[in-house]
Every structure is written in structure tokens, then in C-alpha cells.
Amino acid sequence: MEAQSHSSTTTEKKKVENSIVKCSNRTDVSEKAVASSTTSNEDESPGQTYHRERRNAITMQPQGGQGLSKISEEPSTSSEERASLIKKEIHGSISHLPEPSVPYRGTLVTMDPRNGYMDPHYHPPHLFQAFHPPVPIDARHHEGRYHYEPSPIPPLHVPSALSSSPTYSDLPFIRISPHRNPAAASESPFSTPHPYINPYMDYIRSLHSSPSLSMISAARGLSPTDAPHAGVSPAEYYHQMALLAGQRSPYADIIPSAATAGAGALHMEYLHAMDSTRFPSPRLSARPSRKRTLSISPLSDHSFDLQTMIRTSPNSLVTILNNSCSSWSASGSYGHLSASAISPALSFTYPPTPVSLQQMHQQIISRQQTLGSAFGHSPPLIHPAPTFPTQRPIPGIPSVLNPVQVSSGPSESTQHNKPTSESAVSSTGDPMHNKRSKIKPDEDLPSPGAGSVQEQPEGMTPVKEEGDKDESKQEPEVVYETNCHWEGCSREFDTQEQLVHHINNDHIHGEKKEFVCRWLDCSREQKPFKAQYMLVVHMRRHTGEKPHKCTFEGCTKAYSRLENLKTHLRSHTGEKPYVCEHEGCNKAFSNASDRAKHQNRTHSNEKPYVCKIPGCTKRYTDPSSLRKHVKTVHGPEAHVTKKQRGDIHPRPPPPRDPGSHSQTRSPGQQTQGATGEQKDLNSTTSRREECLQVKAVKSEKPMTSQPSPGGQSTCSSEQSPISNYSNNGIELTLTGGGSVGDLSVIDETPIMDSTISTATTALGLQARRNMTGTKWMEQVKLERLKQVNGMLPRLNPVPPSKAPTLPPLIGNGTQSNSSCSVGGSMTILPNRNELSSTDITVLNMLNRRDSNTSTISSAYLSSRRSSGISPCFSSRRSSDASQAEGRPQNVSVADSYDPISTDASRRSSEASQCDDLPSLLSLTPAQQYRLKAKYAAATGGPPPTPLPNMERMSLKTRMALLGDCRESGISPLPPVNAPRRCSDGGANGYSRRHLLSHDALGNGTRRASDPVRMVSNNLSVPRVQHFNSLNSFNSPALPPSMEKRNLVLQNCTHSEGGVFRGFSSPCPPSISENVTLEAVTMEAGGSLNDEDLLPDDVVQYLNSQNQGTCDHLLNNVLDSNKMHHSVVLGNNNPSSFDRAPPASSQPAGSEVSKSDLPIQWNEVSSGSSDLSPTKLKCSQRSAVQQARAFGLYNNMMVQQQNLQRGNVYQQNGYQNLMENNGSYSLQQNTVLGSGASSSFGMQPNKPYGESVSRQPMIFGAMDSSCGITVQGQKLRSSNMPVSGNQQNFGHPIASSDQATSMANGMQNRNVMEQEYLQNELVGDGIHYQGVNQSSPMTLGQVSPTSQSSLHQGPQSCPPVSHTIGNQSSGLSVAKSYQPCANYSGNRRQNVLRNNLAQQQGHVSDGNQTYRVNTIKLEMQGQSQQFCSNMQNYSGQLYDQTTGFSHQAMKIGSSFFVSEANCLLQETATANSSELLSPGANQVSSTVDSLDSNSLEGVQIDFDAIIDDGDHVSLISGALSPSIIQNLSRNSSRLTTPRASLTFP
């Protein structure tokens, strides 16, 4: 039979081979087939022939070589044909069973493709049996059990095998592939006979063995020409079309294959990757355009862990079970169904007979046309039908294809359009059709009049192009802009990267409060975004930047949005998490947009998306279709403008909902769709997909479409790339929309998410990019824009109330932020600016929860906007949650959504944000952050540094840390008064609010989360204080000046919301790396919280320790510090620091108090131990926080370590350490040694920490050596002295000395320097820093002048620190913090004094040390709290100003000033310290360590910070979130910096 088949098909095969091999010969074709089939980008000509031919090939098969050749030429959607061609190519030289030109397609079944013999028709029953097994197979596929080695077992395997093997389809396909010459051909191609062929064959095999394919083959062979085709086709097709043959084989082979399941399995094993490979194969082959289309690389398709992915994906599994019964449908892409026909059709192809299948196929096809959901639901047959039809008759393929395209195009295709998510399900057999249809809609869009069917043939090529278009989605690459066209800027760059960096750092970051695209001719018309990340993502439309690249081998797609990439990856993995919500409908989609489209078209006749162009009455079921329509008919600009302006009503009808409700297109539409309307609809499907995508991306129905970007995205994006659509039909559509949609990051994001189909997603993203890239589109847009200029207003007003918060958020320090921060659901906030700060604040307060509404990219928005609302609790909360969760959320807002699931991504973000508090809290932000840090440390990546997000998270995280706050019972919203830091709410938190009673306690306001929360005065101060300690203490001490200062700093730093905007280095990178940050934050969602800074246990510990523990710790800190020192020193890893400090902390804690374990973390900040656990917690947080915090922490740690080593009481030892290391060395070493820098996971911090340590040492290192040593001890007792540049502590001590009248030569000098630096730094450093807040003058005031001054001193103190230099400053701040934190160290100070005294002898600075101790003692009583506040504030401010002072201030002076301020603060806060004594100490400790770390971390970021002027924020970030929380508002600011620090 084989021989017969061989001879009979030899001619045909040769023809096919000629046509295919001619083109590319096996290798080339294989390659292309693999890539393009997976990608749906068929090779042109031959490639195209075979790849699109696959499906048609089967159909053409009966016609023999002619049909095949014809199909080869025609970009049919026949996967089988393609498969066959591919396989043929692959096996070109290998003489496989000649594909018998046996004139019986139906008879095809007769041939056992495996054996190549004309075996009985096993397919009908077996096929279905195989189909049935596929359901289990699906599960197996998910489980990865479908590694069938299509063993070349020849006959193998007839019906029984097929039936018996649930993997029948998979096996058959794979086997078929190999089976051709069962043993020889199969082995030859499958085995390593041809390296290229092997992979390719594997790929084909994967197609074949893919249950989908098998099903398709069966479905196609069976359905269209069921029995006949299966028999002959498998052998014939196998040779003729590797894939189709495989499919046929599966149909006929699979049956026999099942018999030799073992061998088949082995073969599969051989092609184990083929499991996945077959996945791609069938997809490529059977439904190359389907989801598989996107996966260009066979690897991604077949060898990709589709099974794993699908297995992992519950939805996907369900879908697979439902849709791809026989396939894990290609590697578990349930809907991959790739042999979707198989899966839905074969698997569920009820008719066991080929005829029935054929009939069913036809019926399904019509149904499909009618249904458009046929592929997804019970009509799995439909899919197979399309597949079969394609397989069946050559004309049938086009015919069926056309119908499929017509019906599938509008509905299925539309669904495919996306990333063929539905397509994956629906067009199981005919991804090409669907895809073609999908593409067609794009093409149709250009010519809405064209008929859907008419375009179908075109669609074939377009299908091929679709993959390209998918890639074209990356068209922004086409844009590849290197010149800046920002308003008032015309700089030219050599590379796109440089341009992006410039835009992110100079323009986006610069406009901290306003997220407005000022790109010339931007269709957004300067409509503000809700979050910076959105703007960053949006700018990719203009620059063409596509930072998100597909990691699949052979796949070159890149996306501007992470969501789109994630969606695209689903095309490789076959994951279809979006299941139709309608009862009885099992269709699943890779993106929400496709699902929405499907639902709207199939299950609803509603067409909620109405064209807003005057005189146009078109209505669509999904936003993408509307966008496409607008772009194609009215011009990209018109749509963009409309959508951008919120003109697009689609938003009102929830994009997703419509998707759910309307399948307007379904049957009727498909029919209608054939007409111009259908075309429109087809395009609409594309558009709709895009819109839906937008929706999906938005995850919130309207959000996606509607956000300021939405309009564009939805409408403009659709057809804007009309011309593009050819490249990437959908993509183009998206591109147009992309441009516009990109206008609204949200839309873009939605598109990403919505563009579930990898292609579509990519397309959506890239379409936007394309739009930019497509000058044509831009021009059209401009024209349209002009035409629709009147409509812009409409669009703009869409959700002004919500949106207002976003732009101001970054722009103005606190207040702006407030505005920005409004919008918990910033996702859809189009006119964030329109709301006033107050409104936003109020709204935020209402929404405030944690920007829970700002689900979308609320992370940024939320944190920013929340922060923007900063005055409100929301801001902080948002920031808090945002920071913790917001950060990832922020990161993933636009790009960092869960691209994979729009809702998931956005909702994830939302959940993240909303969940922030709970979820982050559940995992404690500290824990999350630590996890991130650990992960970063483990992976060698940068520590969790989404500073902006972190900052934003700061507020939100603060909220999440409200876990801390909440733990403490801090739930009150801060008044909506002055906005705190833009992002962090720090401005408000810091500057706007004074130290409230609870704040003063250091427990009061919980970090940014709870600015004014009056919880309990002790409110678990430790936690709040421990990072918020700076804030907490500062809050009381420097509410006025701090407020101002923080305001400025906040504005500058904008840690939460405008995280990026405030930092040049970390922030800009964040902005530039927004995608990365988004991804990182998305993946490490709530890792940047206060908890991030502090481990859970530390937080708990701090909470439990509170203030009382602080004092106790103070005593034990000395011993603890000793242990700490060693421990801390031992912990040199950034993440190690996180863990190690606690570990090291434990010894110290045991010394001091095991319950102070968290102090161990604080230990990291040497003062921590002495301080209260809270302090330690803060320190820990700080450590966890990152480099910036790390600097402060580091120093503290160093000191602590030194002290520990030298024994706090053994100043000599400590001195020796100091001497050995040099005050600097010690600190530096300690920081580094203790891993404060590295420990904190801020490698950049390390250098910074080192530098900082050295710098401070330089000007006051010797001094500080002693002082620091002493201080280290003191810090142990009072945290502050321990700070790395303990000069700062020493200086603060000196300051204290002045205040305390204990002026050692060094201390005096320090004090003097500090005073000088304070004045200078405050005036110069702080102002220089750009904080330009009262802090500079406050610092001057506070400097060594008085304790009351010190109260304000925190503000001034930080500047001093800053002035010290980035590092020095950080140290100063740390010191400042520590002295402030020392208030609880009365006895600690005494001990320190003793220690210092001891130390003095050993260190030249013994006096200073002593003085510091004395001062500390005095201060403890009076200014500890104040000092703590000051420290906290200083830390924040200091961190912020550090960058500036780093540049403009003398390190030594700064150091001393900081010290003086700290001491002053301490002294001034002596009373406060009493109030905050335990908690304050803890906070102090935290501050101390924070100071060290912060300084260090800040220093790390100082360069960037200096540029960004967000130093305070940075340091704030360095400071533990608790401190930030403590200071509530102040805390917010601190928090923001903390985030910054976290993301150097």
C-alpha cells in the first residue's frame, strides 16, 4: 500500500516538492514553515505556498500535485497542505510514502500514513475516538504526558491504536510525520537524519502528532473528506504536506498510531520537544494562523513548554479539554486546538464517521460563519471543519476557508484576529482561515467594501502576513525614531535607545507631575496620562521602542508593552486563560479582547461601539473593530482623536462586556460581515479585537478603550495602520490605534492584553508603534485628527474626574501628585488633570483605598495618583499598596500588566494594588521586597529597584504595610491637606503634617500608608518607626520645614506615583526601564513595601517591640551590635543583608533580646539593636529597601558590626575596627563587609555605600572613625551613631554635643562642619538637591543651633547628609537619623558613652565619640524622638538631598551638619524621644540603619537622584517603610525615597 501510495503520490509529491522545495527546498521551507507556520507568517511564494498551503494542501490533496501545487501558490489556510508541503520539503529527498494521488480523499483514511499503506479507514471511528482520548490527552498534554515519539512504526497503528491511544491525535500526527515511511521515513525525518529537517520535522510532527493536528487531519480529512482524505491524504499528504499528511496520518495514522502508541510515544519522545513541537506544527500546519501563528518558532510552538504552560493554565486546560480534545492541541494550547479542529471538532466531533465529520464540518463551517464561536464551543467540529474543508477540496479549502474566513473571519477570525485566542479555539483546524480572516478584517478595513470571503484568499497571504503583522505590531520598530520631537526639543541621537533614555530622563522624568506627551503631532493632544509608566509606554509609539521581546527561539517579535508580549507568548504556549463566560460555551481565548469579541459577536447582537464620526452610523461589537473602522474609513487620526478624547463610546459599553455580550457578528454578522459591513466587521473584528484587547488589557471594560489612550487605541489603533494592516493587519490596526492607543498607555496596554493573540497583541502594540513607524498612518492620523479635531474635546472629557490625578501627580511635588493620585481606578482616568488636587485627593480618599480602582496601571497611577492625592490617605495608601504591589503594578500597568490576562494583568494590578494591602501585607511588603531582593541577588539582577513604583508603592505599600499600619491599627487617612510627595505622599506626609501624637510616638502614622493615622500612639511604633522612624520622628520634628522640604522633595522625588520622574539614575532607568520595572514589579508585585525593607518577622518584631523594646534593645544593642557587627559583616549579600541582618540580628537580639530579632535587621543598621525592634525593623527595611537605604543601613551595620566585633563596650575593639578600616574603611567595609550595600541587594549601592562611607570618612572619617566607632556603639544604643558614615552620627553627636554642651574636638568640629554643612547643605545641598524645601534652611536652623531647631533640623539634617555628598550625605542622614533615633538610648547613650569613652582611647575621635554618647544621652531624653523624627525626616530629606549635596556639598561638612542636626534633633527631640522612646528608638535605630543604608543607597542613586532631584525620596526609600508610615506624610516621602533606594 505504501509503495502504491508512494508511486501514486510520487508525481503529486514531486509537484508539491517542486513547488515547495523549489522555493526553499526542505531546509528553507522547513525553516519558514516552522517559523512562519508558527508565526502564521508564511513564507512568501514557496514558503507561502507550503505554509498557507498546509491547510489547503489537504484540501488540494485530492487534486494531487496540482491541487497541492496550487495550494502551495495560494496562501490557503490549509494547515494540512502546509504540513504536507513542509513535510514534503523536509522529506523531499527522503522517499516517503509517495502521497498516493489516490483519488480518494475520503479514501485517504485507507492509507495508513504511518505505514504509508492504504489501510482501512480507521479514521472515522478512531479519529473520533482519538478525539475523545484527546480530552484526556488534553489533560495529559497539560501534564506534559503527550510526549509521543511518533515512532516510525510503520503500519502501526490502525484504528485500535488510534482509539486506544488518547494521544491518538498527537501520536498520529507525530507518527505520521515520521510514519510516512513508517520506520525509515519517520525515523529519517524524525530522527536526526536531517538536523534541520529533524527540528522541522519535529515541528511538523508536532503538528501532526498534535492532537489538534491529528484532529484537524482527521477533522479535515474526515470532515471535509473525512475517510477518503484520511486514507490517502495521510500518506499522500504526509509526503505532500508533512503537516497535512501528519494530520491525515493522524486521521488515518493516528488510528494506527494509537496501536503503536508506545512506539509513537517513543517517536514523540524522540520529538519530545515535538510534543510541543507538534503543537506548533499542527498549529502551523493545521492552524498556523491560529494561535500558533504567532509562535513563529517551531520551538516555541512545539518544543515550547506549551504543555507545561497549558497545564499550568487552568483556563487553558479547560479550554483544551473543551476545545482541543485531541490535542493538548498542540502542546496544550488547549485551543490550539491547533488542531482546533481536532480538539473541538475531532475531539468533539460527534460523527465518528468521516462523512459525518465532513457533513459536520460543512455544517460547522456554516455554523462557524454563523457562529463565529464554532471553533470555541461545541463546534469544535467547526474548527476541524474549517480545517477539514481546507483539507478537503482545493476549492473547498478556499471555499471552506472563505466561509470560515467569512464566518470565522468576523467572529472566529476576529477572535483570531487578536492573537487568535479565540482563533486558537475557534479556528482550530483553520487558523489560517481565521487568521486570514483576521488579517482580512485588517485588509478589509482598508477596503471595507471588500467581501470577507473575497478577502479570504487575500487573507491567506495576509494570514501569512498576519504573523508578520503580529511582528509588525512591533512596527514601532518601523518607527525607529532617533530624533526627539518633544515640544521645544529637537535633539538628535544616534540610536533609538539614546532617544528613549533622553525622553525618559529629560522629558518624562522631568515632568514629574504631568504625564503628558508633548511629542509634536501626538494624537493624544497632550492629554495627560494617569501614570508615568503610561507615558513611558506611550512614548514607545513615537520612538518605536519595543523593549519586550519574545524569548522564543526563532520568534523575533517585540512589543512596546509587556502585556502584549505576554499575550503573544500565549501564542507559543497555547495558553487560553480567557474562557467564554456564556454558559455552555467552552471557547477559550488567549486574551480578553478576543473573548469579548467572541461574546459580543457570538452570544450577543449588541453593537455597543458606535462610530463617533459625524455622519457615520457604524456600530461594532468590540472596540478594536471600531478602531479599525475609524482608522481605515475615517483615518487613524480621527479614531485616535476620538478615542483619546473618550469620544469612543465603546468604553461606555464595557469593552469586555460587549465582548461578553455581543457577538453581534456571530452568525448574522458573519453573513453580513461578508458584505462591506462584514468587511467592516472583519476589520472590526480586528478592530474589535484591538478594542477588546484594549478592554482586555484594561481588564476593565471601558478602561481599556476609554482611557485617554483608549480612544486612540480603540479607534485609531484599529485601522490607523490600514496600510500597515497588510503587514500586520491586526497589528496595523493596532498600530494605528497603537499610535493613538499608545496615546493612552492604558489603551495600549489594553491592546496588549487585549491583543491576546500574540500577533494581535504584538500587533496592537506594534501597530501603535507602526502608526508611529508608519508615517503614512501618522499623516492620516494628523489629517484625521484635524478632521476630528472637534471631537477631541469629546474624547478628552471622557473621564476627566478620574484622570485628573495622574498628570499632576508627577508634576507638582505634593499637590500635583495629589491631583494625579486621585484615581484609584486611574485606569480609565482620561482627564486626570481635570480634577483638582483636592478633588483628586477627595476622590482618592474615596477611592483611596489603595488606588484599588487604579487597577490598571494603577501602580504608577495609584501610587502616583494616590501619592498625588498624597494629602489624602489614599495617596499614601495607594503609594503604600502601590509601592508594595503598585510597584509591580506600576511596572506592569501599561507594560507590566499581566499581559497574559488583561483582566488578570490589570486586575492583577488592581488586585495587586487593592490586594496590596492585604496581599502584600499577607506577604508583608518587607517579605515581598526581600523576596525580590533575594531573587535579584540570586539572579544577579538589580535589587528590587522599581523606585518609582516602590515609592508609589510606598504609599500603597505603606497601605499594604498598613499591614504594619493596620497591624498597628493605623487606618486613619491623612487629612487631605497639603499633598505629600507626589508619589509618596511624602510631601504631605513629610512636610504637610507635623509629628502627630501618634507620629511623634513613631507609631502614629504608619508610613505613607497612614499619614495621620492616629492609631495608637505606640501603634507598633517599631514598625512604623523602624523605617518610618525617620519619618515618624521627623514628622513631629519637622512637620513644617519638612513638609515644605518634603513637598519639594516629594515633587522632586515623587517616590510613589512619580517614582521614576524623581530619579535620574534609578528613576529614569525606571522610566526607561519602565517595562522592565513593570515586568519586575509585575512579577515581584508587592516586593517593594515597607515590609520589603523589613522582613515579616522583623515587622512583627518591630510591632511587638514597639518603643519599649527600643529601650531594651538600646541596652542590648551594644551587645547585640557586637553580634550584629559580626553578623552584619557576615552578611554581605544584598539579599543576605535582608536575611543576614535578621540572622545576625538574632544573636544581637539574644544579647539584647531575642524578641528583638527584627532588631537584628536593625542591627544591619547598627543603631537598630539599641534602638527598638522597630528601629531595627526600619533598618532592616532600609537594608531590604536597598542601596540607598543601604548606605544608611550599611554604615549602621558597619558600625554595629564594628561595635559588635569591638564590643560596644569595647570601644577599643571597635576603634581598632574603625582604625583598621578607617572610620571610612570600617564603615565602608562594614557596609560592604556587612554587605549593607550588597546586603541590601543594591549592588550599585555597594559602590555608593563604599563611596559614601569613604566620602564621609574623608571629611570626617577620622573624626567619624572615632565618632562613628563610638557612634556605632551609640547607634547600637541609639542607632544613629552606628550609621556607616558614623561621622554623621558622630557629627550629629557633635551637634548633640553642642546641644548637650559636649563638644569634643572632633565632635565640635563635626558640629561646626555640620552646622556649616547644614547651612550650606540645607541652603545649598538641599536646595541644590532640588528639594528646595524648607529643609535647607531648616537644616541651617536646626544645625547645631538648638533642639527646637533640631525639630526642624530633620529637614535640615538630611540636607546636611546630602551635602555630605551622595554617600556622605547618606551617612549624615543615617547619622542624623541615628542620633535622632538615639533618644531612646539614654542608657544606651550612657553605655555608649562608656563605650565611647573606652573607644575614645582607641580612637582619636574618642572625644567625639564620647561627646556623641553624651549628646546622645542628653538627646535621648529630650530629642530622641525629635531626633528620630529629624532623623527620619532627615533620612528622607537627606537622602533626597544627598544627591545634590553629593554634588554641591562637602561630604565632611555635610556629615557634620547632619550629625549636628541629628544630635540637635535628638536633643530637641529629647522630649519627643521620651514620647517615642521605645518606638522612637526603634525608629531611630531604623533611621540609623536607614540613614546608613539610605545614604549608601542614596549615594548609589545619588547620581541619578542628583539629576532627578529626588534625593529625599531616595533616602525616603532607603528609610524603612515603617518610618515612612510613622511619619505618615513624612513617612510617605521617606517611603518614596525608599522605593527609589530600592531601585537604584
Swiss-Prot record:
Keyword check for Phosphoprotein: yes
Bias kind Polar residues: ranges: 1-10, 402-429, 660-685, 702-728, 1330-1355
UniProt xrefs under SMART domains: ZnF_C2H2
InterPro entries cross-referenced by the UniProt entry: GLI-like (IPR043359), Znf-C2H2_ZIC1-5/GLI1-3-like (IPR056436), Znf_C2H2_sf (IPR036236), Znf_C2H2_type (IPR013087)
Compositionally skewed regions (Basic and acidic residues) per UniProt: 463-476, 634-650, 686-701
Pfam families: zf-C2H2, zf-C2H2_15
Compartments, record wording: Nucleus; Cytoplasm
GO CC terms in record: cytoplasm; nucleus
Protein's job: Has a dual function as a transcriptional activator and a repressor of the sonic hedgehog (Shh) pathway, and plays a role in limb development. The full-length GLI3 form (GLI3FL) acts as an activator (GLI3A) while GLI3R, its C-terminally truncated form, acts as a repressor.
Region described as Disordered: spans on this chain: 1-83, 373-477, 622-728, 865-919, 1126-1155, 1327-1368
Biased composition (Low complexity): 865-882
Gene3D superfamilies: Classic Zinc Finger
Swiss-Prot/TrEMBL keywords: Activator, Cytoplasm, DNA-binding, Metal-binding, Nucleus, Phosphoprotein, Repeat, Repressor, Transcription, Transcription regulation, Zinc, Zinc-finger
Zn finger spans (C2H2-type): 482-509, 520-542, 548-572, 578-603, 609-634
Record protein name field: Transcriptional activator GLI3
Family per record: Belongs to the GLI C2H2-type zinc-finger protein family.
GO MF term set: DNA-binding transcription factor activity, RNA polymerase II-specific; RNA polymerase II cis-regulatory region sequence-specific DNA binding; zinc ion binding
Record PTM text: Phosphorylation is essential for its proteolytic processing. The repressor form (GLI3R), a C-terminally truncated form is generated from the full-length GLI3 protein (GLI3FL) through proteolytic processing.
Gene Ontology annotations of biological process type: limb development; negative regulation of DNA-templated transcription; regulation of transcription by RNA polymerase II; smoothened signaling pathway
Intrachain disulfide bonds: none
